[in-house]
Amino acid sequence: MLARASRFSRSTIAGRRLFTTASPVPTFQTSVLPNGLTVASESMPGTRTATVGVWINAGSRADNPASSGTAHFLEHLAFKGTNKRSQLNLELEIENIGSQINAYTSRENTVYYTKCLETDINQNIDILSDLLTKSKLEERAIENERHVILQESDEVDKMYDEVVFDHLHAVAFKSQDLGRTILGPRELIKTIQRDDLVNYITTNYKGDRMALIGVGCVNHEDLVKQAQKYFGDIKKSEKPFKQSGGDLPVFYGDEIRIQDDSLPTTHVALAVEGVSWSAPDFFTASVANGIIGTWDRSIGVGSNSPSPLAVTAAIGGAGNTPIANSYMAYTTSYADTGLMGVYFTADKDANLKLFIDAVMKEWARLKSGDITVEEVERSKAQLKASLVLALDDSTAIAEDIGRQLVNTGFRLSPEEVFERVEAITKKDVIDWANYRLKDKPIALSAVGNVKTLPSHQYLTKGMSL
C-alpha cells in the first residue's frame, strides 16, 4: 500500500515520540557512512517484519521564503514516478510485495518509511532511495499536485485546531522560518516551479542530514551495506548544518484574534517560549504539563479530580456549569526552541476570560510552589506510562529513533529516559515554572467568538503573578 501520511496525524508531546521501550532483548546499533549518513537499527527478536525509513533533517523550516511550501510539495511528487519506475510500476511493485509506504513533512523533518516483510527489506530500501534521489518531477505531475495541494489547503482552513496553531507560530516567530506554515501560503503554492523543487533537494538532501533507520527483523551489517549501496553517493554538506540557519529564534509576545461568528466553538491557544528537544529541562516541562493536565467535557470530572484546572473547566461556571469544552497542556519542541502552553475550546457564548484566569491561576500555583509531591509523582508515573504505551510497534520505535538522531544527534536509552524522569523533584518543577513562566512574554491565537478574551496587556500582567 502506498500512501502519504496526513500532516494532521503528527503528534503533540504525547505524539512527538521521543522514547523507546524494551522489547525482548532488543539490540540498538549505529554506524556513520563516509558521507555522514547515519545508519541505525534496533533488532526485535521474534518478529518477521520491519520498518525501514529515511529521516531527513529538513522540513518547511528549510524552505526558501520566496517558495514556502516546497518541502511539502516535494512529498506529494515523490510517488508520481522516478527515472527508474513509472508511477504505475511503483504502485504495482509495492502492492505485489505487500509493503506499506508512507511519508510526511513537518517543520523540521521530511520522512519516508515503509513497513515490510523480512524478505523484502532490501527491495524497500531500493524503492526509498529511488523516491528520494530519482524522482522525475515532471511538469504535468507538478501541475496536477498543485491543484491537490490547494484543495488540501482549503481543508486545513476548516481544521480550526490546525489554524490556531499555524497562527500561533506566525505571531510567536513572525517572519522567522518557524513562523511559516508547512503547506505554504496559497499564493506561493501557485507559483512553485520545478527549479524550486530541484534546488530544495540539492540544498537539503545531504548525507550528514539523513538517517536510514531499520527496526524489527533487521541485521545491522546488512543495513549498512544497503545504505552504502543506495545512499553512499549522496554528497555531504559543504559546511555543518544548523537547523535555524543562524542565531536562535526570537519568541515574540504577540497575538492574533479572528472573530468568526459562524463557528459554534471558539479555539484558543496560549504559549510561552518552550523547550527544545535537547533542552536539559525537557522532561521537567513534561512533568509540569502533566500536573496541569488534559480534559474533555465528554469524560466529565469529579470535584476530587487530581487536576484543579480540570475541575474549574468542568464546574467553574455559574451553577457549577462548564467554562470550557476541552483543554490540553502541550509542548511543541524544535531543534533550538519550542512552544509551550494551553490550548482550549469553548462554546461560542462562553466567557473566555474565566478559563484564561483559571490557566493563569494554575501557572501561578506552579510558580508559588503550591503543588504537592503526590502531584509530581503522579505526573511522572503518567509520563513514563504514556511513553511506553506510545511505542508499541516497529514503526513507532523507528519514528522515535529517527526523530532523535536527526534533531539532536543522539538517542537516549530507555534507562536514561526513566532515570531523568524519576530524578525530577517538586523543587525542580517549581524552579522550572519560575524560569520558564515568570514574567515571560506570552503569545495568543484565537478563532471564533473572541469578544470575551481579555486584552494582551491583561495576559502579560498575569504572567507576573
Annotate each PLM feature:
Residues 25-26, 252-256:
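Short beta-strand-initiation
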Residues 265, 277-300:
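A conserved active-site cap/scaffold subdomain adjacent to cofactor or substrate pockets
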Residues 46, 51-115, 294-323:
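M16/MPP (pitrilysin/insulinase) zinc-metallopeptidase core fold and M16-derived inactive scaffolds
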Residues 18-35, 41:
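Short, Gly/Pro- and small/polar-rich lid/capping loops
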Residues 2-14, 18, 32, 43, ...:
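Charge-rich, well-structured scaffold segments of protease-associated domains
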